[in-house]
UniProtKB/Swiss-Prot annotation:
Quaternary structure (record): Heterotetramer of two alpha chains (FadB) and two beta chains (FadA).
Residues binding NAD(+): M324, D343, V400, V401, E402, K407, S429, N453
Residues that, per the record, bind substrate: D296, N500, Y660
Record region (Enoyl-CoA hydratase/isomerase): 1-189
Organism of this sequence: Shewanella pealeana (strain ATCC 700345 / ANG-SQ1)
A single GO BP: fatty acid beta-oxidation
HAMAP family in the cross-refs: FadB
Full protein name: Fatty acid oxidation complex subunit alpha
Listed EC numbers: 4.2.1.17, 5.1.2.3, 5.3.3.8, 1.1.1.35
Region (3-hydroxyacyl-CoA dehydrogenase): 311-717
GO molecular function, one term: delta(3)-delta(2)-enoyl-CoA isomerase activity
Gene3D superfamilies: 1.10.1040.50, 2-enoyl-CoA Hydratase, Chain A, domain 1, NAD(P)-binding Rossmann-like Domain
Gene: fadB
InterPro entries listed in its UniProt record: 3-OHacyl-CoA_DH_CS, 3-OHacyl-CoA_DH_NAD-bd, 3HC_DH_C, 6-PGluconate_DH-like_C_sf, ClpP/crotonase-like_dom_sf, Enoyl-CoA_hyd/isom_CS, Enoyl-CoA_hydra/iso, FA_oxidation_alpha_subunit
Pathway linked to the protein: Lipid metabolism; fatty acid beta-oxidation
Length: 717
């Protein structure tokens, strides 16, 4: 053994080829400070052994190296610039040391080689991957850029255009795509990976392969004609800004870094990368996006933990077909859990199966599936007009019409047809789980399972714990949601649960602005372009359906009359009474037509303005800051109330619920990250300015206390 540490081992193989193996004690290899130090020491040991003629890197895990240890980032990024600069320089000394070894080197890549893992393989002369490999630099998704030479080496290996596409998108690449652009040299079956890597090294040793020219190219300026470079970078800036927009600076920074470093050697190019990395690491966007990543890991960790307590789900059933039932059936079947889709009407079953088939056909068209896989998924969905096929289901998802009496009747009915230990859930957005539980003989096996529409696109599932729900029931539903490819968060029962409870105060703030004469289109523009929501409140209500919104608003008003009760008509009432239900009947706040691609197209409609003006009087203009304050303050305070009341367990889960369930702007990180960034004291002062607008604008005593102590929510957590 040449070198050994808890994360890396180096041994000598035949023909004096050294083998450096990443073998962390956890489930995956990642570059924390300890691993970087170990790699440095391992490379020193290799350099000191004059018998070594070549080096192969590999992994003992299912993935090569998944990236840097992101849990270290927030603390590290809070340090002074000089500390960050020193960290980057020290790490890059190690990667340069790997690249500068006096003999050929190769990476044998299996599974993920992302971020720092990708930067590791770029530092070797050759790269060979097996068919499981996924390679990429996802740092822009965290609001930063690669920091260990990724922006320097990748353009010199695969060309500037390809590198810009890889790094700005942050997507990982399949081995075939990586081979096509020259990021790797060969793709082999997993069992052939190490033999093929050793063969390449031996060919390099007898000069069949020129490793020295390859290495020199990586360390030299980019060979890009000046005019071509200007055109290439200018085009990239336009295309990337169109996708990333002004709220996400990292993708644009990538272009600037590669452009500035194009005519520099390795040392100069790395300095450009370091400076840009440090600047981005200090941004609120990076803090927010890294926070989301860490929150996502926390939620997934909880789901994994729940799996240990969960009842195994081998088969499922959904009651109620149609679009929602079809979406749930598709999601379950496509992730490997067979499901019965039961309805009382054949047309509804046809619609549900049609929805699943439509989603699968789209996957095939995009090349993400095959006709054979599509057929297998459809075979996993069993349509039924009676309960006979439901009897063996481990989990039942009731997804009938949103009406308490209908749901209660169906729940009581299905309980008679399933096994004693089958879990029963209700997909409801507004109806109390405790109320529905009364229809069951065994309420301990019941909880809520709230999917968001469209099911195949929305990552969140709210798992709602009723007062009688057992821990096993909740854990089993969390595990099932996770198996379906969803992100489950557990919330306690209350009107609106978590997501809708915090959404409707936002709509109330919007309605208040309209009552005071604001233009709904102007509000949408501010909330989309400035705050960063994917849809403004008027557009969102049209998509959700103003009939649905009207019903949910009434539920919220009944549940929280002091804050959400109404004394007169609001804009939602006006649209509902005029039977303007949104996209579903082509008229809401906006009017809708179908474009050439069959997608809904929205336009302004004079009728909407006439209806609102008749109820609320003449329009007047509002400043952007006031629009943002009056819509967001109620949502933020209600989110805090949910945490204080134990409806949601942590700031992390609340923020994930908002980002995944509502599309809260990721670059803001969620309500609690937004509050911490703004400063709780600053928020309290802002809310007090609008306190005269009513209970939704009244901050809690705990918020005032936290503000007085200069505290923050994530610091507490």
């Amino acid at each position: 053994m040449i070198y050994q540490s808890p994360t890396i081992e180096v041994e000598l193989l035949e023909d004096n080829i050294a083998h450096l193996c990443f073998k962390a004690q956890g489930s995956v290899n990642k570059f924390d400070r300890e691993t970087i130090d170990s790699l440095n020491a391992a490379l020193d040991s290799i350099k000191q052994d004059s018998s070594i003629k070549a080096l192969m890197l590999s992994s003992a895990k299912d993935a090569f190296v998944v990236g840097a240890d992101i849990t270290e980032f927030l603390g590290l990024f809070a340090e002074e610039d000089t500390v960050l600069q020193s960290w980057l320089e020290q790490a890059n000394v190690v990667f340069n040391k790997l690249e500068d070894l006096p003999f050929p080197t190769i990476s044998a890549i299996n599974g993920f080689a992302l971020g720092a893992g990708c930067e590791t393989i770029l530092a070797t002369d050759f790269r060979i991957a097996d068919t499981t490999a996924r390679i990429g630099l996802p740092e822009t998704k965290l609001g930063i850029i690669p920091g260990f030479g990724g922006t320097v080496r990748l353009p010199r290996v695969i060309g500037a255009d390809n590198a810009l596409e890889w790094i700005t998108s942050g997507k990982d690449q399949r081995p075939e795509a990586a081979l096509k652009v020259g990021a790797i040299d060969a793709v082999v079956a997993p069992e052939q990976l190490k033999p093929a890597a050793l063969k390449m090294l031996k060919d390099a040793l007898i000069e069949k392969l020129d490793w020295q020219t390859r290495r020199a190219k990586k360390q030299a300026p980019l060979t890009l004609p000046k005019l071509e470079a200007m055109m290439s970078f200018a085009t990239a800036k336009g295309m990337v800004f169109k996708v990333a927009g002004k709220h996400y600076p990292a993708p644009m920074a990538v272009i600037s870094v590669i452009e500035q470093a194009a005519q520099l050697d390795r040392a100069g190019a790395l300095q450009v990368e370091h400076q840009a990395f440090i600047k981005l690491a200090k941004t609120e966007v990076a803090q927010a996006l890294i926070g989301i990543f860490l929150n996502d890991q926390l939620v997934k960790g909880k789901a994994k933990k729940a799996g240990k307590l969960a009842k195994k789900v081998n088969s499922a059933a959904v009651l109620g077909a149609g679009i929602m039932g079809g979406g749930i059936a598709y999601q379950s079947a496509s992730k490997g859990t067979p499901i019965v889709m039961k309805d009382i009407a054949q047309p509804a079953l046809d619609l549900g199966l049609g929805e699943a088939a439509k989603l699968l056909t789209a996957q095939v068209k995009r090349g993400r599936s095959t006709p054979a896989k599509m057929a297998a998924v459809l075979n996993n969905i069993t349509p039924a007009l009676d309960y006979a096929p439901v009897k063996d289901a481990d989990v039942v998802v009731e997804a009938v019409v949103e009406h308490p009496k209908v749901k209660s009747m169906v729940l009581a009915e299905v309980e008679q047809h399933v096994s004693e230990d089958a879990i029963i859930t209700s997909n409801t957005s507004t109806i109390s789980i405790n109320l529905l539980a009364k229809s069951l003989k065994k309420p301990e096996r019941f909880c809520g399972m709230h999917f968001f529409n469209p099911v195949h696109k929305m990552p969140l599932v709210e798992v709602i714990r009723g007062e009688n729900s057992s821990d096993e029931t909740v854990a089993s539903v969390v595990a099932y949601a996770s198996k379906m490819g969803k992100t489950p968060i557990v919330v306690n029962d209350c009107p609106g649960f978590f997501v809708n409870r915090v959404l409707f105060p936002y709509f109330a703030g919007f309605s208040g602005l309209l009552a005071d004469g604001a233009d709904f289109a102007a509000i949408d523009k501010v909330m989309e372009k400035q705050f960063g929501w994917p849809m403004g409140p008027a557009y969102l209500l049209d998509v959700v359906g103003l009939d649905t919104g009207h019903h949910a608003q009434a539920v919220m008003a009944e549940g929280f009359p002091d804050r959400m009760g109404k004394t007169g008509k609001d804009a939602i009432d006006v649209m509902f009474e005029a039977e303007r239900f949104g996209q579903k009947n082509s008229k809401g706040f906006y009017q809708y037509s179908v474009d050439r691609r069959g997608k809904p197209k929205k336009d302004l409609d004079p009728t909407s303005y006439e209806l609102l003006q008749a109820e609320f009087g003449e329009q007047k203009a509002f400043e952007s800051d006031e629009i943002i304050a009056r819509t967001m303050i109620p949502m933020i305070i209600e989110t805090v109330r949910c945490l204080e009341e134990g409806i949601i367990a942590s700031p992390a889960e609340a923020d994930m619920g908002l980002v995944y369930g509502l599309g809260f702007p990721p670059f803001r990180g969620g309500v609690f990250r937004y509050l911490d960034t703004m400063g709780v004291a600053n928020f309290v002062a802002l809310a007090d300015k609008y306190a005269h607008l009513g209970g939704l604008y009244q901050v809690t005593d705990t918020m005032r206390e936290l503000a007085a102590n200069n505290g923050s929510y994530y610091q507490q957590a």
